[in-house]
Curated annotation (Swiss-Prot):
It is found in: Cytoplasm. Catalyzes the ATP-dependent 2-thiolation of cytidine in position 32 of tRNA, to form 2-thiocytidine (s(2)C32). The sulfur atoms are provided by the cysteine/cysteine desulfurase (IscS) system. InterPro entries: Rossmann-like_a/b/a_fold, TilS/TtcA_N, tRNA_Cyd_32_2_STrfase, tRNA_thiolation_TtcA_Ctu1. It catalyses: cytidine(32) in tRNA + S-sulfanyl-L-cysteinyl-[cysteine desulfurase] + AH2 + ATP = 2-thiocytidine(32) in tRNA + L-cysteinyl-[cysteine desulfurase] + A + AMP + diphosphate + H(+). The lineage of its organism: Bacteria, Pseudomonadati, Pseudomonadota, Gammaproteobacteria, Enterobacterales. It comes from Cronobacter sakazakii (strain ATCC BAA-894). It comes from the Bacteria. Its EC number is 2.8.1.-. GO terms for cellular component: cytoplasm. This is tRNA-cytidine(32) 2-sulfurtransferase. The thiolation reaction likely consists of two steps: a first activation step by ATP to form an adenylated intermediate of the target base of tRNA, and a second nucleophilic substitution step of the sulfur (S) atom supplied by the hydrosulfide attached to the Fe-S cluster.
């Protein structure tokens, strides 16, 4: 076997392994949150980025072996950004035989008109997109709207809300839409961004960059993303542990009086789950919760250097 054939064989092996992991992650998220049910018509929101391409690919793959029958329709919102390659998505989706709809709305013009030069456009752009996608879901008879946010997006949102909003609020894997008419799901909720990026590169998806918001410097989310990437590189398992913490909340050991009745604690009250930590320190496991090395090398642990968040 030639060296080129050997490399190709190894690349295919790694791609298969990566796809299986993504399939497993998506399958577990779907099962844990009951994202997809018998007869569902899933509107897959396709932006032309690595995340939405990967979501569509994995859902199509799972569709062949899922215990329930569901259909997919891909939807792209053409926001009329200058230089947007309108032909790429229709050609790609047609080649796959996937049902799709391209929605043309000049949200780019609205955002540029309303937002002063130098200010971030994400908030207004997101609101405009959301309303259009809800309307489109109704027109298509979709029962679920699938978005391509992954585990890293969810953690970034948690830290954004803690650092800047004073709230412990993330990005739910499943929720009711703002208009109360649609269920929104995030099938990639358990998937790592670095897995998605590697999968996207290996598959050669025709990526379309977002010129509206992707090039804005010093976004708060980008600062948080850089911090998390740094932690992931230097402290293997930290990201997994933090995400695991979002799934293991103990309201009695936080400070939110809406979540737990602290005033109702009296002599003779029942002991709450979580234990008594008034005098004893909680035992912390040596290995991070939820972390498995998989194929990632584990560099030596380092002392924490606190990053400055502005």
């Amino acid at each position: 076997m030639s060296e080129i054939q050997e490399i190709s064989k190894k690349e295919q092996y790694n791609l298969n392994k990566l796809q299986k992991r993504l399939r497993r992650n998506v399958g577990e998220a779907i099962a844990d949150y009951n994202m997809i049910e018998e007869g569902d018509r899933i509107m897959v929101c396709l932006s032309g980025g690595k995340d939405s391409y990967t979501m569509l690919e994995i859902l199509r793959n799972l569709q062949q072996s899922a215990p329930v029958n569901f259909s997919l329709v891909a939807v792209n919102l053409d926001q009329k950004q200058p230089g947007f390659p309108e032909h790429i998505l229709p050609e790609y989706l047609s080649s796959l035989g996937v049902e799709y709809k391209i929605v043309e709305e000049n949200t780019y013009g609205i955002v540029k008109e309303k937002i002063p030069e130098g200010k971030t456009t994400c908030s207004l752009c997101s609101r405009l997109r959301r309303g259009i996608l809800y309307r489109t879901a109704t027109e298509l008879g979709a029962t679920k709207i699938a978005l391509g946010h992954h585990r890293d997006d969810i953690l970034q949102t948690l830290f954004l809300n803690m650092f800047y909003g004073g709230k412990m609020k993330g990005m739910p894997p499943k929720l009711m839409s703002d208009d109360g008419k649609h269920i929104v799901i995030r099938p990639l909720a358990y998937c790592r961004e670095k897995d998605i990026e590697r999968f996207s590169q290996a598959k050669g998806f025709p990526i379309i960059p977002c010129n509206l918001c992707g090039s804005q410097p010093n976004l708060q989310r980008q600062v948080i993303a850089d911090m998390l990437r740094d932690w992931d590189k230097r402290y293997p398992g930290r990201i997994e542990t933090m995400f695991s913490a979002m799934q293991n909340v103990v309201p009695s050991h936080l400070c939110d009086t809406e979540l737990f009745d602290f005033k109702g604690i009296h002599h003779g009250s029942e002991v709450v789950n979580g234990g008594d930590l008034a005098f004893d320190r909680e035992e912390i496991p040596m290995m991070p919760a939820g972390w498995t090395p998989e194929d990632d090398a584990a560099p030596p642990m380092q002392r924490l250097d606190v990053l400055e968040i502005k």
